[in-house]
């Protein structure tokens, strides 16, 4: 009788989220009033109990930076993903042996065929395993043999769903990262860990206090990362990496931006139907309007092939204990993007947007747009900085391209 979203009513959940000023995911997870109240209490308690001073760790270990030895063999996780498969392509141009940890070799081969007409696999070996399992799902002898070979691990595997059961994301993004860390310690290998710029929480979660800038020297800016399952899992994964760094493991963290299609041929991710950014763009085109909250958040268009090249360039400098922000710094506001495309649209109030969206709630693009619109209204804009990363990339001969009208 206290069910807040009878029949799994998503628009109702979104409306409650905006009215009660609480995460929409929490309403999905705890649709009954008593359970919702208990969950809110637990979140507050979890916030109090977070005692790892991540910012101090970043500052302290930054003074311990040192060059790693030349890499001869690398282990790549997530090679079947959109970014991972492009990182693999970049690795094939390096003088290294490449071991790809995959759960399914057939899917791995299918991904290669989908993204590339030609790729040199002469130094690529597949290892059937699973980061979610102890010893990466390998036999003791296989694990030991691999640990003796590997110099660095490029950990790209992740669950990137922004809503769902936290246990699923935690299993991959947190526990999986812990298993990769354990392997790196056993192998005395450098960990190259992919994270996300979304750890800042802008347009997604509230802030506890008012730090409005996220650069490469900080993680905790007061964001209530617990309010979103994806951000929470990636924030906690960074905590694990930083704790390992404090314990002596050489690590780098790469916070990835809004990955978009390749330059040149426009090839995009295979599962583009799940891409939230495309849903938002499609919704704006259908509605002919942009909510006033969302228009203030500029977007980066980070071409996946450029991101992969930047990642590998930085990994192979040998620098360790770094944090990098891998996104194209040539930001676009929604207004600027649609002006370039000569697409007419209006900036409207939240109330007008809600009324229009509810009238079209059966449309998936508009449904997703509503989700992002509501959560963006609860968060302040966070200024992202990556000047340090851009300078380091410049040293490797890399420069981000300007998004053109054609792109």
Residue ranges and their predicted role:
Residues 1-64:
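Phosphopantetheine-dependent thiolation modules in NRPS/PKS and related acyl-activating systems
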Residues 67-94:
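N-terminal Rossmann NAD(P)H-binding glycine-rich loop of SDR-like oxidoreductase domains
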Residues 120, 124-175, 185:
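NAD(P)H-binding glycine-rich loop region in Rossmannoid oxidoreductase-like domains
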Residues 154-155, 163, 167-171, 175-229, ...:
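Conserved Rossmann-fold NAD(P)-dependent oxidoreductase catalytic core, especially the SDR/UDP-sugar
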Residues 221-225, 271, 275-306, 310-314:
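A conserved pocket-lining segment of Rossmann-fold NAD(P)-dependent short-chain dehydrogenase/reductase
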Residues 238-268:
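Conserved beta-loop-beta element that borders a ligand/cofactor-binding pocket
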Residues 261-277, 314-324:
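Glycine/proline-rich active-site loop of Rossmann-fold NAD(P)-dependent oxidoreductases
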Residues 310-373:
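Mid/C-terminal beta-alpha module of Rossmann-like enzyme folds, strongest
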């Amino acid at each position: 009788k206290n069910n807040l979203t009878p029949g799994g009513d998503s628009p109702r959940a979104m409306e409650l989220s905006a009215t009660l000023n609480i995460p929409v995911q929490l309403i999905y997870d705890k649709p009954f009033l008593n359970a919702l109240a208990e969950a809110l209490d637990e979140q507050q308690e979890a916030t109090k109990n977070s005692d790892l001073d991540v910012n101090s760790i970043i500052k302290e270990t930054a003074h311990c930076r040192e060059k790693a030895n030349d890499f001869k063999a690398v282990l790549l996780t997530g090679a079947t993903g959109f970014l991972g498969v492009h990182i693999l392509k970049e690795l094939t141009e390096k003088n290294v042996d490449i071991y790809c940890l995959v759960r399914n070799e057939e899917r791995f081969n299918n991904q290669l065929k989908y993204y590339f007409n030609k790729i040199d696999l002469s130094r690529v070996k597949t290892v059937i395993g699973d980061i979610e399992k102890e010893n990466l799902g390998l036999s003791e002898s296989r694990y030991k043999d691999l640990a003796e070979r590997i110099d660095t691990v490029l950990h790209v595997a992740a669950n990137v769903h922004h809503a769902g059961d936290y246990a699923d994301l935690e299993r991959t993004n947190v526990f999986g990262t812990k298993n990769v860390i354990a392997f790196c310690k056993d192998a005395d290998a450098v960990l190259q860990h992919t994270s996300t710029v979304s750890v800042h929480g802008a347009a997604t979660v509230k802030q506890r206090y008012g730090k409005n800038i996220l650069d490469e020297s900080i993680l905790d800016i007061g964001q209530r990362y617990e309010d979103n399952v994806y951000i929470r899992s990636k924030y906690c994964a960074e905590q694990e990496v930083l704790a390992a760094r404090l314990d002596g493991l050489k690590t780098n963290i790469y916070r990835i931006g809004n990955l978009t299609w390749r330059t040149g041929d426009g090839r995009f991710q295979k599962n583009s139907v799940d891409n939230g950014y495309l849903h938002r763009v499609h919704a704006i085109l259908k509605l002919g309007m942009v909510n006033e909250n969302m228009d203030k958040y500029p977007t980066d268009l980070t071409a996946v092939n450029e991101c992969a090249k930047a990642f590998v360039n930085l990994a192979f400098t040998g620098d360790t204990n770094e944090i990098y922000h891998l996104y194209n710094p040539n930001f676009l506001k929604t207004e600027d993007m649609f002006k370039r495309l000569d697409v007419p649209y209006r900036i409207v109030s939240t109330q007008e947007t809600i009324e229009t969206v509810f009238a079209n709630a059966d449309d998936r693009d508009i449904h997703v747009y509503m989700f992002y619109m509501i959560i963006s209204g609860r968060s302040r804009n966070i200024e992202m900085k990556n000047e340090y990363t851009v300078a380091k990339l410049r040293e490797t001969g890399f420069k981000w391209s300007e998004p053109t009208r054609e792109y």
